[in-house]
Amino acid sequence: MDPIALQAGFDLLNDGRPETLWLGIGTLLMLIGTFYFIARGWGVTDKEAREYYAITILVPGIASAAYLAMFFGIGVTEVELASGTVLDIYYARYADWLFTTPLLLLDLALLAKVDRVTIGTLIGVDALMIVTGLIGALSKTPLARYTWWLFSTIAFLFVLYYLLTSLRSAAAKRSEEVRSTFNTLTALVAVLWTAYPILWIVGTEGAGVVGLGIETLAFMVLDVTAKVGFGFVLLRSRAILGETEAPEPSAGADASAAD
C-alpha cells in the first residue's frame, strides 16, 4: 500500500485532531457494551432484574452517543484563557457524565435499598460535582479554574462519603450476594472516579502536564471501565434478581462456594 495514501487516510480519520482515534474506539466499545447488555437481558422476565437492565443499558447507550458526537467534532468548544492559550473543551463529555453518573449511583442505591431522600441527595451532589467541573473547564483564569475544580472535588468526596456510609450500611443488612456485589461495585467506583479529578488537574483543562491525545485516551479507558465494566459486574450477579430467575453467580460467589 502506498505510504502516502495510508498517511492521507489516517489524517482524514483524525481530521487534524489527535484525539479522534480514541473517541472512535470509545464509541465502538460503548456500543458493544450496550448491545451486549441488551442481548443479555432480552429474555429476562424478573421485574427487579428488568429495572437494573433498563438503567444499566442506558449508561453505555448515552455514552456512545456522546462519544460519537465528540468523534464528529460536536460538543466541543474553544476557550481562550487569560494567558492567550486556546483550549479545546469537550463539553459533551460533561453532558455524558451528567446523565450517566446518576444512573450508576441509582444502580447502587437500588442494591442497597435506601430511601428516596438519600437517593435524591446523592444524585443532587453528583450533579453538582459534574456542573462545577464543567464551569471550571470553561473558566478563563487559573484561579477560577482551580477553584471550581476544588469545588467539584469536594462534591465528589461527599458522594464517596455517602457510598461508604449510608449506602454501605443499608447494603450490609441485605443478603450476602447483595453485600458482595455492592462492595465490589463501590470499590470500582471509588477507584475509577478518584482518577477523574486527578486526570483533570494534570490534563489540558488543568496544569497541562499531558496533552489532549493522552488525556482523551485516559478518559476513554476510565469511561469504558466505569460504565461497561460496572454493568458487566452488576448484571452477572444474583443480587439484581427476585425469586424467579438467576444469572450465573458472580466471581465472589463462586469463590465462596469453592471454599
Curated annotation (Swiss-Prot):
<keyword id="KW-0375">Hydrogen ion transport</keyword>
<feature type="transmembrane region" description="Helical; Name=Helix B">
    <location>
        <begin position="50"/>
        <end position="71"/>
    </location>
</feature>
<dbReference type="Pfam" id="PF01036">
    <property type="entry name" value="Bac_rhodopsin"/>
</dbReference>
<keyword id="KW-0406">Ion transport</keyword>
<feature type="topological domain" description="Cytoplasmic">
    <location>
        <begin position="172"/>
        <end position="174"/>
    </location>
</feature>
<keyword id="KW-0716">Sensory transduction</keyword>
<feature type="transmembrane region" description="Helical; Name=Helix A">
    <location>
        <begin position="19"/>
        <end position="40"/>
    </location>
</feature>
<dbReference type="GO" id="GO:1902600">
    <property type="term" value="P:proton transmembrane transport"/>
</dbReference>
<feature type="topological domain" description="Extracellular">
    <location>
        <begin position="7"/>
        <end position="18"/>
    </location>
</feature>
<feature type="topological domain" description="Cytoplasmic">
    <location>
        <begin position="245"/>
        <end position="259"/>
    </location>
</feature>
<feature type="topological domain" description="Extracellular">
    <location>
        <begin position="204"/>
        <end position="211"/>
    </location>
</feature>
<protein>
    <recommendedName>
        <fullName>Archaerhodopsin-2</fullName>
    </recommendedName>
</protein>
<feature type="transmembrane region" description="Helical; Name=Helix E">
    <location>
        <begin position="143"/>
        <end position="171"/>
    </location>
</feature>
<dbReference type="GO" id="GO:0007602">
    <property type="term" value="P:phototransduction"/>
</dbReference>
<feature type="modified residue" description="N6-(retinylidene)lysine">
    <location>
        <position position="227"/>
    </location>
</feature>
<keyword id="KW-0681">Retinal protein</keyword>
<feature type="topological domain" description="Extracellular">
    <location>
        <begin position="139"/>
        <end position="142"/>
    </location>
</feature>
<dbReference type="InterPro" id="IPR018229">
    <property type="entry name" value="Rhodopsin_retinal_BS"/>
</dbReference>
<keyword id="KW-0675">Receptor</keyword>
<dbReference type="GO" id="GO:0005216">
    <property type="term" value="F:monoatomic ion channel activity"/>
</dbReference>
<comment type="similarity">
    <text>Belongs to the archaeal/bacterial/fungal opsin family.</text>
</comment>
<comment type="function">
    <text>Light-driven proton pump. It may interact with bacterioruberin in the claret membrane.</text>
</comment>
<feature type="modified residue" description="Pyrrolidone carboxylic acid">
    <location>
        <position position="7"/>
    </location>
</feature>
<keyword id="KW-0472">Membrane</keyword>
<keyword id="KW-1003">Cell membrane</keyword>
<keyword id="KW-0157">Chromophore</keyword>
<keyword id="KW-0813">Transport</keyword>
<keyword id="KW-0600">Photoreceptor protein</keyword>
<feature type="propeptide">
    <location>
        <begin position="1"/>
        <end position="6"/>
    </location>
</feature>
<feature type="transmembrane region" description="Helical; Name=Helix C">
    <location>
        <begin position="91"/>
        <end position="112"/>
    </location>
</feature>
<keyword id="KW-0873">Pyrrolidone carboxylic acid</keyword>
<feature type="topological domain" description="Extracellular">
    <location>
        <begin position="72"/>
        <end position="90"/>
    </location>
</feature>
<feature type="transmembrane region" description="Helical; Name=Helix G">
    <location>
        <begin position="212"/>
        <end position="244"/>
    </location>
</feature>
<keyword id="KW-1133">Transmembrane helix</keyword>
<feature type="topological domain" description="Cytoplasmic">
    <location>
        <begin position="41"/>
        <end position="49"/>
    </location>
</feature>
<dbReference type="GO" id="GO:0009881">
    <property type="term" value="F:photoreceptor activity"/>
</dbReference>
<dbReference type="GO" id="GO:0005886">
    <property type="term" value="C:plasma membrane"/>
</dbReference>
<dbReference type="InterPro" id="IPR001425">
    <property type="entry name" value="Arc/bac/fun_rhodopsins"/>
</dbReference>
<feature type="transmembrane region" description="Helical; Name=Helix F">
    <location>
        <begin position="175"/>
        <end position="203"/>
    </location>
</feature>
<feature type="topological domain" description="Cytoplasmic">
    <location>
        <begin position="113"/>
        <end position="115"/>
    </location>
</feature>
<feature type="transmembrane region" description="Helical; Name=Helix D">
    <location>
        <begin position="116"/>
        <end position="138"/>
    </location>
</feature>
<keyword id="KW-0812">Transmembrane</keyword>
